[in-house]
UniProtKB/Swiss-Prot annotation:
Gene Ontology molecular function: any one: rRNA binding
Record-annotated disulphide pairs: none
Cited NCBIfam families: rpsS_bact
BP GO annotations: ribosomal small subunit assembly; translation
Gene3D superfamilies (alphabetical): 30s Ribosomal Protein S19, Chain A
Alphabetized PROSITE patterns for the sequence: RIBOSOMAL_S19
Protein name from the UniProt record: Small ribosomal subunit protein uS19
Pfam families reported in the protein's UniProt record: Ribosomal_S19
Encoding gene per record: rpsS
Organism: Halorhodospira halophila (strain DSM 244 / SL1) (Ectothiorhodospira halophila (strain DSM 244 / SL1))
Keywords associated with the record: Ribonucleoprotein, Ribosomal protein, RNA-binding, rRNA-binding
Job of this protein: Protein S19 forms a complex with S13 that binds strongly to the 16S ribosomal RNA.
HAMAP family with a match to the protein in the record: Ribosomal_uS19 (MF_00531)
Record flagged with keyword Transmembrane: no
InterPro entries linked: Ribosomal_uS19, Ribosomal_uS19_bac-type, Ribosomal_uS19_CS, Ribosomal_uS19_SF
């Protein structure tokens, strides 16, 4: 179930502060964050945010189509290596 519209979008305060500093300084350095639950805001468009996927930080360039989605949607946490091979076919 989506978040109530009367509550508004959620963004961690420490991430919001880093985004505001990057916009004020016109910084192009990636912003490192562990906050996968934060919603992409219009202020973030054009910034590179390094989102933690549980093992490393994945750099993601934010564009207009990502606004309203959560940061965690853009850093995949699971890697599918394929199903196990059929042992009968090897005989």
């Amino acid at each position: 179930m989506p978040r109530s519209t009367k509550k508004g979008p959620f963004i961690d305060h420490h991430l919001l502060k880093k985004v505001e500093e990057a916009n004020a300084n016109n910084s192009k350095r990636p912003i490192k964050t562990w906050s996968r639950r934060s919603v992409v805001m219009p202020d973030m468009v054009g910034l590179t945010i390094a989102i933690h996927n549980g093992r490393q930080h994945v750099p993601v360039l934010i564009n207009e189509n990502m606004v309203g989605h959560k940061l965690g949607e853009f850093a995949v946490t699971r890697s599918f290596r394929g199903h196990a091979a059929d042992k009968k076919s090897k005989r």
